[in-house]
Amino acid sequence: MDVKAFNRSLWVFHVNTGSCNGCDIEIIAALTPRYDVERFGIKLVGTPRHADVLLVTGPVTREMAKKLKRIYDQVPDPKAVMVVGNCGSTGGVFYESYNLVGPVDKIIPVDVYVPGCPPRPEAIIQGVIKLWEKLEDKRRGKC
Amino acid sequence: MMMTTLSTIRGFWDPVLWMAAFIIVIVITCYIRSLGKEEYKRGTEQTMVFFSGNIPPKELISSSNIYWGFFKAMEKYYTCIRRFHTGMVNDYVYYFIVIVIVIIASLIIGGVLWM
C-alpha cells in the first residue's frame, strides 16, 4: 500500500441517515482503545467542511436525502464516501420501504461499501484503508 | 521619546521585545494558515455554514439567546432593574449623589458610634 501522496491525517465526518445505531456503535468501537484508529491519524470531525471522508450509515430516509446531498457538497475536494452497513449499501431489511429513497448510492456517489449488520470494526478499518488508497489516486488525479 | 526597559521588583517590561514577540506570533500564525486546505470552491456549498445539513436560517440567532432561560428565571429582577436604566445622565448623577450621601452618612454615623 502506497499512501505517500496523502501525507496527513484522514479526517472523517459521520452521517446517520436513518441507521438503527448498530453500525454507529461499531464505528465508535473502532475508535476505542482495542482498535484505536486515531493512532493512524484517522479521526471523526464535527463538520463536513473539515473532512476528507464522508462516512454514511443507514438507509436514506426521505427526510435525510436533501440533507445528505448538502453535506456531501460541503466536503472539500478531493473527497471520498464510505458506506458502513447493509442498510446504507442495499437498503437491507428496509429495502423498498415507503419511507426510503436510498440506498446511499442513489443520492451521492459511493467509493467503498462495508457490508454487515453491523460490520465488525476490523471490516470498517479495512474499508477505511481501501478508501485511503482511493483518495490517494484522486489526489494524484488517477480517477 | 526613547523606549527603554522598565524594571520592577516582579520583572521587566520592554516594548521592543514585546513587538518582536508579537511579530513572531504573526509569522507563525501565517505559516500555519498557509498549510490549510486550498481546495475549497468559493460560492458553493463548500464555503457555506454547516447547519446539520439544513439550509442556514437567514435571521441570525444572537449569542444572547443562550441566556434565554437565565433571563426568564430572573424576569422579575430584570423588570425592576430596567426601570433604573433610563439612559439619562441626570438620573445616573442623581443615583451617584444618593449613594455618596449614603456612604458619607454611614461613615459619619459609624464613626460617631465608634467613638
PLM features: residue spans?
Chain A
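Iron-sulfur-associated redox domains of electron-transfer enzymes in respiratory
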Residues: 1-143
